[in-house]
Amino acid sequence: MVRCDECLRANPPTRVNCLYCAAVLPLNETTINLQKPALRPLEKWEQGYNNIILPPAANPPQELAAAALHEAAALLRLPPADLALILSLKTPLPVARAAAIDEALLVERRLGSLGINTCIVADAEPGTDAMGPAKVRALGIDDTRVYAFQTPEAPAIQISWSDFVLFVVGRLIVKRVELKEQKGARAENRILDAREFVTDETVVDLYTRNQTTPYRITANSFDFSCLSTRKGLLASENISRLIDFLRERAPHAQYDDSFNSVRKALDFIWPSEQQNISSGWRRERPGKYSIGSVTELSNEMQFLRYSRLRYHFHRKADKENDHA
């Protein structure tokens, strides 16, 4: 057992934090290899610490031994096949999301001993806006700059073509299920009406040189008048043409469309978020009441985290090139 220095209570040697007061437990030669991260699912409002697999250049080229793979998977509370998929993609991806920095450091140290190099990226990374991306509804374009409009009333944000550094493209998928149930005397409710809606739209985050918060364009919430004669009838066509046009005008900006190919691996650590909403009770007729509910599953936060991760490594590479 390990004694907590704060509350003086005994804790199992596998714990990182005190079971009673949450203080960090002291390490010694005996417990350093016994500690195991809890890696509990975080609430929506909690800020976590992400262990990110480093690019292939930072990891040995040989295949991970089966025993090491199973040990790493057990540490991360993942099926070995899921961890193998993450490693096979050979790109920076999350393998764990911890509630505390000490837990993330433990994961980093233990994975490093198995030959898997990682780094820690906090949700609340310096410069990250908690409000999310700046959503752009329309663009004005000339030879030197872009004029981004967030609302018809707000003044345009002026962005020089030379300021664009990264375009991250993905898909936003929202599944919405609406239920109307009749409450009965029995345990089970009778479903009166059920509807399911799915939206799937292309999204692009535009990162600029001096701002960490991206400008976001979504296909179904954008006025494509800036395309002029290139504008088509379908939003899915127009968003592709807009992205091509932006890349033509800013060829120096890095283009990343890897989100769709790694989305399955992201689900293991950054799953789509579910929101449950109740529309309340309604009296249908005397003695009969119904209740409505809405369940919405969205990958918007998943894409935002991945977009910020790509920008994190883009900025890191730029700093390394400047020092070289």
Label each residue range with its predicted role.
Residues 1, 15:
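Residues immediately within or flanking Cys/His clusters that coordinate Zn2+
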Residues 8-12:
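Short, flexible, mixed-charge glycine/proline-rich loop motifs
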Residues 44, 48-60, 106-140:
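A cross-kingdom feature marking charged/low-complexity
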